[in-house]
């Protein structure tokens, strides 16, 4: 319990450093670019994109508190820059919840492929499949059970692919030594 409390306190303290804010701003810019040029919408219910990678890097570097706030602000900014439909706070909540989950799994831990797969599976099942489908049902009235199978299949197909992409990119960046500037050595 004490370890969890310290993780949240340390992550919250990350918000007070200029370097954290600067890195978050750079990651936000990268996410906005990826959202504009590297996203594919397949109908109104399925979107494939890579703008979540900078979010996960922020969660990895700065933890669940900073990552959660970063994701919430970035989701709203993304909406204003490139709206894909009506604004709905449920999707912002989902971005924040996903960041919180990733932050809990990644922050101050050694990043392994198994850890990434597990974190991504939790996010896929809770956030992407259940909550996003619920919000789409509330917004468009298409029926939760009608769109659930399509969204489940898409997310389960993308789960290992997204996990591999994030893990590979993060490991490559880690090998350059850039992350060591912002992050203490991993514990476990």
Language-model segment annotations:
Residues 1-188:
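Loop-helix junctions at membrane interfaces
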